[in-house]
From Swiss-Prot:
GO terms for biological process: axon development; cellular response to oxidative stress; dendrite development; negative regulation of cellular response to oxidative stress; neuron projection development; positive regulation of dendrite morphogenesis; positive regulation of excitatory postsynaptic potential; positive regulation of neuron migration. This is TBC1 domain family member 24. The modification Phosphoserine is found at residues 473, 480. The Rab-GAP TBC domain is essential for phosphatidylinositol binding. The keyword Cytoplasm applies. Interacts with ARF6. PROSITE patterns: TLDC (PS51886). Residues 47-262 form the Rab-GAP TBC domain.
Length: 559
């Protein structure tokens, strides 16, 4: 290999221009926490040789299946698979979904080598059905490998990781599509300004968010992608979400106020990412990414599982050749103007609310469950109409024409588990909002202030609660497992008082007050600040009710 350690697959001039080889040559650190800090700081980013050594070490330490193909396997099979075909003309495996091989700083020989390696990976991993990130991973690894066989072995170890708590790259359409939905949920929570812009300019927001992995695995320039991959190998999948969120934040900062077209926003983001050096350095991108105070890996895994479950229930497990990705029937499609009738909100307002709900439920269409004008002003009838539906949307219109409400994650039948006593239940996906006189949404306080909580110690006992709190006997059966308060150590239960219902009142939010309190006759209500949502009053603090509605979420396929 030529100095400073480039192999025969790399264009030396491009590599010199992309990465200055000025960094340290050795790494003695063995502690994971220190390694995390060094990866984030880019300790080996300026040394081609050291990055190669670090990749070798980190990938070697990935726990893998007992029989994982190594370099010798590649040497045995490559000739049979490739034959006498020119490597530049080799077809790519179907599982890359027409993703092109990013050249980065590879020469023509290197680009051909990536194709050979991908075909050999397809041969050894027949269970991979969808993996558009793999060409970028192999292309990057080839820059830092001695030869094709070593690069193949590294890729095999990443694909063969069998640590259940360590997710690397998606290898099925179900995993990929649920990650897109999860990313959409995270954007909704942590990049609300950018999400609002995407909703305004795109008819199908999930189609924009479905591109998130491409931003990282293909569009980012080498010096940026390599920095992301450095941290990814140490910290895992969560860093990918972080960086993609940071990219969207920078895109919004640059493009807010500029005209965006619905049919071009996807391409606009790709172009922005390709030219990201004009906007932000790799250091600033990672700095922004790690300034986002995301939930724990465990909570994100719960959300991913919930999204996978929703897709399975809809029969979406493989990509259909005749249609695009499972479309979030978003905004203009989910809420049909010709079919939608409400005494409280307009179609436009319902579309605004729909843009806030979790991705797995935004796939559904609104279904009117209860209307005070149709079913009467009775809380008992409200419960009867809502039971069996999860989640639900509560809408309230006051006699002063104020409009407010709540997204409620859990079936109201849960209230029956408290033996007639008033007990709180629900999850941190609940939120409250007002629409008139102005729009404002208030989410669970922990989303904005994660310092309120920390992951519970192993086998920790549940703290005693002033009010009863419900936990499902089988969390896998819950439709809304994400952000269940039982997964957190909270200083008090006032931060997790989501919803409660008795015969004489309905409450949303608690601690220091109630975000919403409605009496048993659906006649009077009150609203104030509460600890759970850290909200301002949603309307006049004491109000008379003109109308109440409850809406469910109906799968279009069941209509």
């Amino acid at each position: 290999m030529d100095s400073p350690g480039y192999n025969c697959f790399v264009d030396k001039d491009k590599m010199d221009a992309a990465i200055q080889d000025l960094g340290p040559k050795e790494l003695s650190c063995t502690e994971l926490q220190e390694l995390k800090q060094l990866a984030r700081q880019g300790y080996w980013a300026q040394s081609h040789a050291l990055r190669g050594k670090v990749y070798q070490r980190l990938i070697r330490d990935i726990p893998c299946r007992t029989v994982t193909p190594d370099a010798s396997v590649y040497s045995d099979i490559v000739g049979k698979i490739v034959g006498k075909h020119s490597s530049s003309c080799l077809p790519l495996p179907e599982f890359v979904d027409n993703t092109q091989v990013p050249s980065y700083c590879l020469n023509a020989r290197g680009e051909g080598a990536v194709r050979k390696i991908l075909l050999c990976l397809a041969n050894q991993f027949p269970d991979i059905s969808f993996c558009p990130a793999l060409p970028a991973v192999v292309a990057l690894l080839l820059h830092y490998s001695i030869d094709e066989a070593e690069c193949f072995e590294k890729a095999c170890r990443i694909l063969a990781c069998n640590d259940p708590g360590r997710r690397l790259i998606d290898q099925s359409f179900l995993a990929f599509e649920s990650s897109c939905m999860t990313f959409g949920d995270l954007v909704n929570k942590y990049c609300q300004a950018a999400h609002k812009l995407m909703v305004a300019v795109s008819e199908d927001v999930l189609q924009v968010y479905a591109d998130w992995q491409r931003w990282l695995f293909g569009e980012l320039p080498l010096c940026y992608f390599a920095r992301v991959f450095d941290v990814f190998l140490v910290e895992g999948y969560k860093v990918l979400y972080r960086v993609a969120l940071a990219i969207l934040k920078f895109f919004h900062k640059v493009r807010a106020g500029q005209p965006l077209e619905s049919d071009s926003v996807k391409q606009d983001i790709r172009t922005f990412v390709r030219d990201i050096a004009k906007t932000v350095s790799p250091e600033k991108l990672l700095e922004k990414a790690f300034a986002i105070r995301l939930f724990s890996r465990k909570e994100i895994q719960l959300l991913q599982m919930a999204n996978e479950k929703a897709l399975k229930q809809k029969g979406i497990t493989v990509k259909q050749k005749s249609v695009s990705l499972s479309k979030r029937q978003f905004v203009h499609l989910a809420v049909h103007a010709e079919n939608f009738r409400s005494e409280i909100v307009s179609v436009r307002e319902m579309r605004d609310i729909w843009s806030w709900v979790p991705e797995r439920f935004a796939l559904c269409q609104p279904l009117l469950l209860f209307s005070s004008l149709q079913h009467g002003y009775s809380l008992a009838r409200f419960y009867f109409q809502c039971e069996g539906h999860e989640p639900t949307l509560l809408l309230i219109k006051t006699t002063q024409k104020e409009v407010c409400g709540a997204y409620l994650s859990t079936d109201w039948s849960e209230r029956n588990k408290f033996g007639g006593k008033l007990g709180f239940f629900g999850t941190g996906e609940c939120f409250v909002f007002r629409l008139q006189p102005e729009v404002q949404r208030y989410e669970w306080v922990v989303i904005k202030h994660p310092e309120l909580t920390k992951p519970p110690p192993l086998m920790a006992a549940e703290p005693t609660a002033p009010l009863s709190h419900s936990a499902s006997s089988d969390p896998a059966d819950r439709l809304s497992p994400f952000l269940a308060a039982r997964h957190f150590n909270l200083p008090s239960k006032t931060e997790s008082m989501f919803m409660a219902g008795g015969s004489d009142c309905l409450i949303v939010g608690g601690g220091g007050g109630q975000a919403l309190y409605i009496d048993g006759d659906l006649n009077r209500g009150r609203t104030s600040h509460c600890d759970t949502f850290n909200n301002q009053p949603l309307c006049s603090e004491n109000f008379l009710i003109a109308a109440v509605e409850a809406w469910g979420f109906q799968d279009p396929d069941t209509q």
